[in-house]
Amino acid sequence: MSEFQKVVVIDAKGHLLGRLASVVAKQLLGGQKVVVVRCEELNISGHFFRNKLKYLAYLRKACRYNPSRGAFHFRAPSRIFQKAVRGMLPHKTARGQAALEHLQAVEGIPPPFDKQKRVVVPAALRVLRLKPGRKYCTVGRLSSEVGWKYSDIVSKLEERRKVKSAAFYQAKLAKQKKIASAKAASSVNGKLAEFGY
């Protein structure tokens, strides 16, 4: 992500939460608009039970006499990711708030972004950064265990999207094949070569 683009869409599947958050935070401070899709597929290193215990301990942090004052703990994977990024930004300054407004994180791949080119961040990919055999868990599973209710809906919508995109890809391949065969069959190129073009 060295060159500046209007909006960068990152597919979060298979990325480590903290490593991706640090890269995104750096880009946001540079003025780049970033959209992170499939936040439920983010990974956290360490086995699931340990991460769940850590999250439950985090949920116990609240105002003693009036819990509605805060601290507020989000259960949705997209909000967990946003909070991780916020911790890496100077969010109490105008510059940090402006950077945070350029971030959009969502579960699944909703319609505006399913037609856009998605990128990955090699510096944050689990397969490249985590030693083979190490335990890890997904943010989606952790979220659904601590109160996120929309895991089934997101997975159902994702299955539907994958079927549509597979059909689109097959149609695209068929079209490319037709164009290639038409180019091979045409004798126009030969005629043009005869006349020196």
Swiss-Prot record:
Predominant subcellular localization, coarse grouping: cytoplasm
Pfam family, any one: Ribosomal_L13
Record has Transmembrane as a keyword: no
Localization: Cytoplasm; Nucleus, Nucleolus
GO biological process: cytoplasmic translation; negative regulation of translation
Listed InterPro entries: Ribosomal_uL13 (IPR005822), Ribosomal_uL13_CS (IPR023563), Ribosomal_uL13_euk/arc (IPR005755), Ribosomal_uL13_sf (IPR036899)
Residue positions where Phosphoserine is found in the record: 151
GO MF annotation, one: structural constituent of ribosome
CDD domains, alphabetized: Ribosomal_L13
Keywords: Cytoplasm, Nucleus, Phosphoprotein, Ribonucleoprotein, Ribosomal protein
GO annotation, cellular component aspect: cytosol; cytosolic large ribosomal subunit; nucleolus; preribosome; ribosome
Assembly: Component of the large ribosomal subunit (LSU). Mature yeast ribosomes consist of a small (40S) and a large (60S) subunit. The 40S small subunit contains 1 molecule of ribosomal RNA (18S rRNA) and at least 33 different proteins. The large 60S subunit contains 3 rRNA molecules (25S, 5.8S and 5S rRNA) and at least 46 different proteins.
Protein family: Belongs to the universal ribosomal protein uL13 family.
Function: Component of the ribosome, a large ribonucleoprotein complex responsible for the synthesis of proteins in the cell. The small ribosomal subunit (SSU) binds messenger RNAs (mRNAs) and translates the encoded message by selecting cognate aminoacyl-transfer RNA (tRNA) molecules. The large subunit (LSU) contains the ribosomal catalytic site termed the peptidyl transferase center (PTC), which catalyzes the formation of peptide bonds, thereby polymerizing the amino acids delivered by tRNAs into a polypeptide chain.
Note from the entry: There are 3 genes for uL13 in S.pombe.
Protein name as catalogued: Large ribosomal subunit protein uL13A
Organism, scientific name: Schizosaccharomyces pombe (strain 972 / ATCC 24843)
Gene that this polypeptide is encoded by: rpl1602
